[in-house]
Amino acid sequence: MITVSAIVFVRGDGRVLTVRKRGTTRWMLPGGKPEAGERAIDTAVREVHEELGIEIAPEELELLGAFDSHAANEAGQGLRATVFTTRRVVDPVVQAEIDELRWVDPADRDPDQAPLNLEVVFPILTGTARRS
């Protein structure tokens, strides 16, 4: 099981920031794996700074939830993602291991999106999540 933290950045037009890491084909939320002893929220803050040059304080984030899914780029691996959201206006810059970024409509069913986005996060954002 891979553990990650991520942030959903939502623009005023409802589009969500996604990134594609170098050497991969799937689009995912900005974020990444924790360092030893790091809290999920601190991981998310650190990763978006490293990947996109975005400085954001933990107080600016709201917990969307902790979700299980499938890793986008590591076949056969499970994923445990703690996901935060913010409507803070950001101007991301591609850095570190990020190759590209794009703002997407979460209602679109782009098959190049990571399973976490398609199966969990985007349905929550669009109000189409299945209720158990």
Indicate residue ranges for each PLM-predicted region.
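Short loop/turn segments immediately following the C-termini of beta-strands
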Residues: 21
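A short acidic/small-residue loop/turn micro-motif
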Residues: 24-25
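Residues at secondary-structure transition points
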Residues: 34-39, 74, 79, 98, ...
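Conserved hydrophobic "DFG−1" position in protein kinase catalytic cores
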Residues: 9-10, 18, 86, 103
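The catalytic Nudix box helix
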Residues: 29-64
